[in-house]
């Protein structure tokens, strides 16, 4: 339980730090009305991704660079540019400006890109089907960029842990609250599992320590036989002292 408590505390610290950084962005209005959610996405991605790893007992994987350089994040030491645009095609086209690094898109947009590249017959975004023309344009942009990079699309396109709507200014508080609640829920579940396992192991150990019925009966029988033999030996010896041997016993002696 100590390990679980430590993992929980570490995860929540990551969320708190990210939330503070996001609130600073919101209060300062960084990025303006149209760009603020991009900065929110960077810090939220870092905090939530690291919090989830911390709860699993793993080291941090993501760092927010926050230095106005070309890369927004370092993920496992690799530079990553984060793009959260409302328009999927415009979002993809920015990849040409960052060919020295991976690109990260919102989770729901990556689901669309993945479905397109897997050749799904129907592709949806926010419950609405994309037209065949939209699907074709998305596929074309990804294939052209992949050819220039010399990589398959899944080697340079990464998915955020967050959807586009989750990093909007009016939604980010709820996003962090839900993530915090999720960590607490998992903590409660794992605590119950640990407690149940401890009780099960304790019961199994107790049961193993007890002799089974067959062993108990066998032990009782052996004990009775030994006691009976001992009593008979004493009886014969007493008769011998009285001058009577066993072959001289009468029915009354028996």
Show the residue positions of the predicted features.
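Glycine-rich short-loop/terminal segments
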Residues: 1-44, 58-62, 184-210, 214, ...
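Generic structural hydrophobic/aromatic packing signal, biased to beta-strands
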Residues: 49, 103-105, 233
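Membrane-active amphipathic alpha-helices enriched in small hydrophobic residues
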Residues: 216-237, 250-254
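Charge-dense, intrinsically disordered terminal/linker segments
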Residues: 67-84, 88-98, 181, 189, ...
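Extended, hydrophilic extramembrane loops/domains of integral membrane proteins
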Residues: 103, 137-141, 145-199
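Catalytic centers of nucleases
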Residues: 17-99
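Charged, low-complexity interaction regions
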Residues: 244-249
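A recognition module on extended beta-rich or small alphabeta surfaces enriched in W/G with H and D/E
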Residues: 89-153
């Amino acid at each position: 339980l100590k390990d679980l408590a430590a993992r929980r505390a570490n995860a929540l610290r990551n969320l708190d730090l990210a939330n503070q950084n996001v609130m600073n962005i919101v209060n300062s209005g960084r990025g303006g009305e149209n760009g603020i959610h991009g900065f929110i996405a960077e810090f939220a991605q870092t905090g939530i991704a690291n919090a989830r790893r911390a709860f699993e007992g793993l080291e941090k994987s993501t760092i927010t660079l926050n230095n106005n350089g070309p890369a927004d994040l370092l993920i496992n030491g690799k530079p990553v540019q984060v793009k959260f645009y409302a328009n999927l095609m415009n979002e993809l086209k920015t990849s040409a400006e960052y060919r020295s690094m991976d690109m990260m898109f919102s989770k729901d947009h990556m689901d669309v890109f993945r479905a397109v590249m897997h050749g799904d017959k129907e592709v949806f975004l926010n419950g609405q089907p994309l037209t065949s023309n939209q699907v074709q344009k998305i596929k074309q942009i990804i294939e052209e960029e992949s050819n220039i990079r010399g990589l398959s699309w899944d080697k340079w396109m990464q998915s955020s842990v967050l959807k586009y709507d989750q990093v909007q200014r009016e939604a980010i508080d709820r996003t962090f609250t839900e993530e915090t609640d999720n960590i607490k829920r998992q903590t409660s579940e794992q605590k119950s599992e640990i407690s149940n396992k401890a009780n099960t192991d304790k019961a199994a150990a107790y049961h193993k320590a007890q002799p089974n019925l067959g062993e108990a009966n066998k032990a009782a029988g052996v004990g009775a036989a030994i006691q009976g033999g001992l009593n008979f030996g004493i009886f014969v010896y007493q008769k011998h002292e009285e001058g009577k041997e066993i072959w001289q016993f009468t029915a009354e002696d028996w």
